[in-house]
């Protein structure tokens, strides 16, 4: 067997290996894979296999132009300095022909380049420009019938146990996926679902570049990503499984993370190994096919794979059947949680084991005639249409797992003969219009219900939804000749019975337009409370409608005994953030948060604000008072988080608490005793101290942290400021009993921060020999630490003049002069500005943010707005109460609550991984929930779906939804949710105030007022404008007038 590029049989350098098997060696996939690992190929996490020249998976690719790409995605990328976040936005369906034309157009085509290195540089340089379209996650195969060698649709590996024993088919995991790429389409850093193997074959087109990190160094990449993206990390431990994070090779190289790269040409295979992180991009238009597979070596990886916990539809495979079947000697101790096993990433997989041989022999005996996997299989049953609103914004929340993938409404056909993607027949528009559907109605009526799902006897269709998902069931008889149809997938029906689905027109998603990263000045008049600032994509970028040649339906056929089907989302959908760029300075003209006029502190007026009372002697406008600084530092050292730098993310003052509670918290801290030598975990991420990737003096992250992630709390012997050694940049050998902070070492008793108006706290010297708070240097965007590990040489020279002119809403009336540099609220275009220490003292919420932002700041107004919905829902509304809500004319009016209804819904997780949180209790057929109440949490149940079939599920919980029937003054009624209703004592949002009117149209005046009042105060009759005399007017009186006039004219003519 020929092996090139790497000579060492064990591959100690973990380099990507390339293999060139002979035709004889190529015939047995599992045997050759074991050979590859015996040479150490798995240590790189990625390997290339160049098949024999005589092997062809498909003879011709000219006949796939009409293959439908049901849900293309547009990949928007944000970020800088080698650290990026990718968001996938679903677009309208198109054919391969249309996609190829788009990929080769001047807007999306590959730029000119000298070599692959030059193209790679252009990729990382232009990553954030011109969002490309990716035809990803298309369930199906384009292998020719009869190709047995390395057939991605049937590799015959131990992963087949999932479908054979459990009857579950996971699209893209144990079925093949097709990918149509164009220049710059990307797959972000990730390992495979459940840390499985994967295989990728590039059928034709331009090359594909790959990056790979050896499995033995995967944890290092995770730690680096957690540091750069702390917000994502806090939301989900396995956030890299979201497939949204891009880290450039230059960043990996800088932080010492081993990686290798390779280019895959057309006609070559790439194999990824368990826990091998990989990423890459396409050089231009191409077509690839891939799937997952497994060996016995993978089982130990699957047992410890870290799974995404924030999304309900991420792939999760029960390891029970694998351990029981292939590791029987360890099954019992594994079930007891005592199977302690450390994975050896260097160990190759065995060619076979007695358990595998037994399984293969049994499989051969039970093997049925091969069934084609070509074409699309139907998806799993999806949540009800009522959940559609949650998908509209491509949100990342996971009630019913919104926005994590394009929810296709699948339709499967069965032609007269077995039809494959490779043998698609073109049909004209006329033929499509003449197509008739004839379905034996008895098949629909006589289908027996069962918990495992029923055999399909209906024709189903597939819709790539845009902003949301919607469906309506119709009978075959409702299909009209010439009705708009969409192409059917080609292959067999798998799983549950589908229905004919009515196609609903959905709007294209709106994409927030990015703000220019310049020092743009915004006045408050320009502020927009809405989080998203969107505009439609350029017209013509994606074909607006399906072409006529894609219309038509074929007669279905019953396929028996098919497994349930779920789906793996390789490129989940996401929503780009709508927020201001890091360097944007928004000038404040007049803020709603401005404090009432207060005389200057210098005039010795008693402070009334609770948050400002402890600071009375710390304002820089007062004479230096080192004893006051000592007292303040010593007091706050006893308050969580016990570090003067970590406190940036955990302020001492709690604005939501009462005045008495805040005063009590401060008094308690004064009387506490400081514990010395304690180690705690810093809550401020290390990456908050990094300004950009160009910090060349920066050593590996967390240089001064202990191995367990903790750091020693140390206190200055003179000023009593308390900090983590790692946060303040103190090496372990400098920590001693009489440790002094930087300002006390220099006896700088009058030192004060040049970035704010307060004294005290942890200070470091700047490059121009001034002083600055470490927390100010962290939070002000343009300030950087030249020496990051030691937090020294603070550079403040890059602060723009616009920022220096901003006025702090907290101290502008407490001091006589404007000084320091303010930060601003991160919400949209909010111009609220404040000093870092003032905002911290007042309790403004600051949180670590993902790169390239450092902290996310939320002012009080937007903190209230973000919680308004939940707080509003806490207030009860009764029948007869006067409230404010939106009328059908889109304006807001006062109205009266006339009825309140409630409905209890159950939250269930179906066997195929789909999720519903609005299941009616009466739909649970395995238990009489109306009489007995809900089942126990986690109990297995049977759910009757609207399609009339039964599905297995697990009960997760319940929720209650309330609807309020309101009546307006004009007599019209409407049912509203609680979050859409405002009581008279609630503060109305600005957008509601702008559209609030005192009375609706008095169409039914006598309902509310007497005839005498109406006669005297009736509105004047509206007259139709002469400009609109030729326009259609939706007015019954006017239409009656026109009709009578027309009839009179006709009578005269007669």
From Swiss-Prot:
Kindly list the places in or outside the cell where this protein is found, as annotated in its UniProt entry: Nucleus
Molecular-function GO term, any one: zinc ion binding
The cofactor(s) it depends on are: Fe(2+)
User: What's the name of its gene?
Assistant: Kdm4c
Q: What residue spans carry the Acidic residues bias annotation?
A: 386-396
* Role: Histone demethylase that specifically demethylates 'Lys-9' and 'Lys-36' residues of histone H3, thereby playing a central role in histone code. Does not demethylate histone H3 'Lys-4', H3 'Lys-27' nor H4 'Lys-20'. Demethylates trimethylated H3 'Lys-9' and H3 'Lys-36' residue, while it has no activity on mono- and dimethylated residues. Demethylation of Lys residue generates formaldehyde and succinate.
Stretches with biased composition (Basic residues): 361-370
Which residues does the annotation say bind Zn(2+)? 236, 242, 308, 310
ZnF (PHD-type) spans are 687-745, 806-863
Query: Under what name is this protein listed?
Result: Lysine-specific demethylase 4C
**One annotated GO biological process:** stem cell population maintenance
Spell out the Pfam families in the cross-references.
JmjC, JmjN, PHD_2, Tudor_2, zf-HC5HC2H_2
Presence of keyword Disulfide bond: no
The note on the cofactor says:
Binds 1 Fe(2+) ion per subunit.
According to the entry, every stretch annotated as the JmjC domain falls at 144-310
Gene Ontology cellular component list: nucleus; pericentric heterochromatin
Amino acids binding Fe cation = 190, 192, 278
Q: Tell me the ranges covered by the Tudor domain, including all copies.
A: 875-932, 933-989
Q: Principal localization?
A: nucleus
